[in-house]
């Protein structure tokens, strides 16, 4: 499942570049696939694993519609290939994290990101067997049955594509020993809120991967402003998020508008600082810190 998401991301990455190449030279598609496979699967210890990874990547690019293992295997030799690929995805010993990091690093080298975007990923399911399936009343989706996750998107001027994701596991799964055992949920995985899941998804990427530290756009409901924003502040990562109109903030930088205004809403701070607004583009600097020009240093009041 994790590999499926990675393949979808790679498909987005390859799309425009490869479509242009294929229009002129059909054989460039496979050459580009091999080139990207060498980058993505370099962490695989065995040659046969790297080869299967390349075949899976090529099959996912050729498959139209739903990219299930069965549909992908149809381009690789039918039922025998399906069984082999199913084992490779579900039961092999390779680690998926280096694959995701390799994708994000490769993209960053091609074109540095402007931001990392966290976005909800609802996955409708009819049955009960998929890990994390639950039925909830969602304020946006209404009554929803399925899995809930958060994706982390690489966002540049020319391309937006997912590079990682984190599955939300409800308490009904984590407190059920039978479900935990059947789904092979690690012992160290504990309960978290949807908000915590969204934050952890992107901080795990920026805290452990070799990717540029860019501002985070957090497209998720933020209810615990002090806790959530505090995590980004401690990590030194600017964040853009929606907050309620009753939440109050304090401007910390004495040189910025609103510093002497006490506790203000986000809208009041934005109005006071409207003279500082400017269109942001990529710079030559390797990182974006909390003290960057044009960045408001604010913190929620407690």
Question: PLM features: residue spans?
Answer:
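Short, glycine/acidic-rich beta->alpha junctions
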Residues: 64, 99, 144, 220-224, ...
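Gly/serine-rich nucleotide phosphate-binding loop at the start of the catalytic core
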Residues: 2-87
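Electropositive, glycine- and tryptophan-enriched low-complexity nucleic-acid-binding patches
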Residues: 83-87, 140-212
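Short, well-ordered, mixed-charge alpha-helical segments that flank or form enzyme active sites
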Residues: 125-127, 160-161, 171-176, 223-227, ...
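Active-site-proximal, Lys/Arg-enriched surface segment
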Residues: 89, 93-171, 283-286, 290, ...
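An internal, acidic/charged active-site-proximal segment
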Residues: 186-302
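Electropositive nucleic-acid engagement tracts
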Residues: 48-49, 60, 64-128, 240, ...
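Conserved short loop/turn motifs at secondary-structure junctions
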Residues: 57-58, 88-91, 214-221
